[in-house]
Structure formats: C-alpha cells, structure tokens
C-alpha cells in the first residue's frame, strides 16, 4: 500500500503555503489519488479535510495536518480537498469542528483548553466550518473552549452543539472524534 495508508509519510500539509499558486492543483492531485487508493481498498469515506487553522502554538501533531495559518487558505485548500474526494467517490468527513487550531496540547493525551474569545473564534476558526456548512458529515473536536463552555469539551457540550447548529449552520451528520482519547474523562 502506498502513502497515505503506509508508514511512509507525505510532506506535512502545513507547508502548503510554500507551493504558492500551485497549492490548489497539488491538493487536487493529492486528494484525488487518495480517493482512488481508498476506493481500491473498498473504503468509501475519509476523515478529511482537516479544517483547523494552524498557529505557532498549535500542537505539532495537528499542525502538520493543517492547510494554512489563516482562514482564507484553509477554506480554499479545504474546498479543493473536499471536492476532490467527493468527485472521486469518497464521502469527506470535515474535521475538527468547530476548530482545533488554537489547541497547544494533543487531545489524544489530554484535554486542550482554548482561551480565545467567542468573538475571535466566530470570526476565524468557526468561520472556516461555516464555509463548509454544506458538508454531509463532520467530526467534532475534543477541545474545551473556555469562553463558551468552561466545563465540557466541544464534543460533549450543549453550548458548542448549539453554536455548530445555529451559528455555523451545520445540519449534517455530526460524529465524535475517538471517545477513547484521554481528552475525555
């Protein structure tokens, strides 16, 4: 099996901006090839695109899967990835709704706490997901947004679910990230 399913790794996606105007065509090729490989194995969905905005403080485990450091780049490249998967017969699952980019900790091992204001989140991270409110399936994030719900991770928070449904306007199927991750009690 060739990458991305093998142990060999493709170059980190957080370097996509270095491709300049070629980034979109590279993403189309990359995600079209990924779709072809998945279909050849009988797999018809992929937990991609990753729509988190990378920041200098984003945990490296997530950062190398992000498509950019601003919402415009993430939306543009995320849409190319989404469309390439879908047009090649794969159901894309957007993630990590409503945004994981502010997290400086890996949710596989602990619950990341985001201290950004609700206003900043709505204008940036949540705005990326609003641009994809037409998606059929999304995966939630195990991240605690202190300004919105200081007690529950987004994946278990009624307040965050209300934001996802009412502010982001996502009406599709919402699935949880892995519930065995240490971020959840």
Regions found by a protein language model. Name each.
Residues 1-73, 102-114, 141-153, 176-185:
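Enzymes and membrane/adaptor proteins characterized by extended Gly/Ser/Thr/Asp/Glu-rich
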């Amino acid at each position: 099996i060739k990458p991305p399913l093998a142990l060999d790794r493709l170059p980190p996606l957080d370097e996509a901006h270095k491709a300049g105007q070629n980034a979109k065509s590279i993403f189309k090729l990359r995600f079209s090839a990924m779709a072809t490989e998945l279909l050849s194995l009988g797999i018809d969905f992929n937990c991609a695109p990753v729509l988190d905005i990378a920041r200098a403080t984003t945990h490296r485990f997530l950062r190398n899967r992000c498509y950019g450091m601003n919402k415009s780049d993430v939306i543009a490249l995320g849409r190319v990835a989404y469309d390439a998967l879908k047009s090649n017969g794969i159901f894309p699952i957007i993630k990590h709704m409503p945004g994981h980019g502010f997290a400086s900790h890996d949710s596989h091992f602990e619950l990341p706490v985001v201290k950004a204001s609700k206003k900043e989140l709505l204008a940036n991270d949540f705005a990326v997901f609003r641009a994809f409110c037409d998606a059929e399936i999304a995966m939630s994030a195990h991240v605690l947004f202190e300004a919105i719900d200081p007690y529950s991770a987004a994946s278990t928070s009624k307040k965050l679910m209300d934001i996802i449904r009412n502010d982001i306007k996502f009406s599709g199927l919402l699935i949880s990230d892995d519930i065995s991750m240490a971020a959840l009690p």
